From Swiss-Prot:
Formation of the three residue Trp-Tyr-Met cross-link is important for the catalase, but not the peroxidase activity of the enzyme. Belongs to the peroxidase family. Peroxidase/catalase subfamily. There is a cross-link at Y229-M255 (Tryptophyl-tyrosyl-methioninium (Tyr-Met) (with W-106)). One of its GO terms (molecular function) is metal ion binding. The record marks R103 as: Transition state stabilizer. Keywords: Heme, Hydrogen peroxide, Iron, Metal-binding, Oxidoreductase, Peroxidase. Binds 1 heme b (iron(II)-protoporphyrin IX) group per dimer. There is a cross-link at W106-Y229 (Tryptophyl-tyrosyl-methioninium (Trp-Tyr) (with M-255)). It catalyses: H2O2 + AH2 = A + 2 H2O; 2 H2O2 = O2 + 2 H2O. It comes from Nocardia farcinica (strain IFM 10152). Bifunctional enzyme with both catalase and broad-spectrum peroxidase activity. This is Catalase-peroxidase. The lineage of its organism: Bacteria, Bacillati, Actinomycetota, Actinomycetes, Mycobacteriales.
Amino acid sequence: MSVEHPPIGEANTEPAAGGCPVTGRLRHPLQGGGNHEWWPNQLNLKVLAKNPAEGNPLGDFDYKAAFNSLDLAAVKADIAEVLTTSQDWWPADFGNYGPLMIRMAWHSAGTYRSSDGRGGANTGQQRFAPLNSWPDNGNLDKARRLLWPVKKKYGQNISWADLMILAGNVALETMGFKTFGFAGGRVDVWEPEEDVYWGPEAEWLGDKRYSGERDLENPLAAVQMGLIYVNPEGPNGNPDPLAAAVDIKDTFGRMGMTVEETVALIAGGHTFGKTHGAGDAALVGAEPEAAPLEQMGLGWKSSHGTGKGADAITSGLEVVWTTKPTQWSNDFFEILFGYEWELTKSPAGANQWVAKDAQPIIPDPFDPAKKRLPTMLTTDLSLRVDPEMEVISRRFKDNPDEFADAFARAWFKLTHRDLGPVTRYLGPEVPSEVQLWQDPIPAVDHELVDAADIAALKEQILASELSISQLVKTAWAAASSFRGSDYRGGANGGRIRLQPQLGWEVNEPDELARVIAVLEGIQEQFNAAQTGNKKVSFADLVVLGGVAAVEQAARNAGVAVEVPFTPGRADTTQELTDPEGFAVLEPKADGFRNYLGKANPLPAEYLLVDKANLLTLTAPEMTVLVGGLRVLNANYQRSPLGVLTETPESLTNDFFVNLLDMGVVWEPSPADDGTYVGKDAATGAQKWTGSRVDLLFGSNSVLRSLAEVYATDDAKPKFVQDFVAAWNKVMNLDRFDLA
């Protein structure tokens, strides 16, 4: 529903050009003002300093141990008690908060988008802005307050992130549905995630994210600002079920859901509960972030009647889908296909549909003596009018057990999508069946290599035809596919030699294939020579190759260093790898390799910071890695851009020394290709070339201050030490067994 909300705040998208670039009075820093108001396009490096230890009230807390100490059955029993204990301050529809908890869990997980892995339930972000105040999350603040007694009782043994998802599962189970399972392991954070791009709009329900016919901007999935998925009234409130079907399939597809999973989720979720649109939405007050202090973090206070219970207003729609809203059934499909539908308005004026020639068979949420006519949303009718979804819907209607299984699996996928591989799952209800979307890696079934083996393998790798550059690039390509947003990717599994990673442009497929062949030969030779069960995996060998190369490059620079290496990675197979599912991990840019693909929405330096953010790097770690990778000659296609050294493949601090050299003047390349030329200030002779990413470390004041640390005459040992530490961090980002 198109409810008016205060604007988020107009964004100044114009670059600062001389003089003060702002108008009006600047805000106090405590009000959100600061440098960004003067220079709105300033690179935001704060995304590389997320969730600092100083902001964590728990300190060095072992959540895994705490969660595993829980009596999960007792927690679930306490949640179940909450569900059927109606509170006067927010009465339960049909005497059961189960549907409200399902919506809370759904919307916690449903912000996930597969394109960058951001969003989702993993850190409990629904507690914070902007999500706690999105129009689509209206009155979910009440759901979390209802759960407070449970959270209070069990304290830090269960995170809010886990509790919200568990409450959704308990709601389903207590209403007669058999879930697929539940895994804990979501760790709370203590601040909003401000590195997530939710869209360009500066007002609720705006849709500037579209271009062309209806092309949705990447990486977004939702159709409008402040919605989790689609507009239930139809595109921009237009009650066209067929047009809404296009949005549904696009949006759910961008979450990583198939069309069958999408149908199952919509129908399964809408088997329970109701929507709320009892009256004029203009009577609803401000969202939590804009509400007055005395409301204590609760928003959407309504002056329509009592403002709650039978008078509640949330979406503005007033729909009850089934005859048994607190019981699992096949009613949704029976009713969807059992009637013809005509457009009507809710009491709040929202577009919805009512059954023609129907009897009032739908229960009232608060008066058992009353019955209602069957009603549906525009997006519900999409499941009937869209040819592809109709076939699935009719099959589910005629095969209730198949529908129940599909919903159970889709719900589990929805609520666990950003939790990472099964090795991160906690608790007694983790299902034994592994799903393809979990990126399965077989368990290590052999003895691991020891220190002597590692030393011998490093010698053999360095004696091969492979260069330091090739070894570094291959290890980086494998490990840097990791995303800290949803814990996907990384070197474990050895997927660098499988499709689609083997064919990614940034990985230089032809050269990569040659490197893989050599490493596989070394692996086969080593494994064949063993008499017992000792083996080296290909995944371990890729990382070990990088380790050997970095150590040799340091020796070339006159520094002896031992790069840490812990074996234990396993090799997966092409059959256990979904090429379409992995395609979203392909880098469109990688500033660490000076790679910039085509049609990127932001300049290369912004994309570098985004990549560093996904790799969970700090600004110093990003800085030292870029400088080190440049002198290791690890650029895409061995480009000379930023290779500011006369001795490539030596781990020197030359990149920083030469970048900050005042005897070099930089200017845009005459090729007008976005690159730069560094010339001798005295002679005008060309000395170097560089990219926007390279020059960033001399231009940006914060990054220049970091570059200066590594450019001093006494910096070489520290540079090598810090590079090795950052390199080792990236190589082990997906080693959850080491945590």
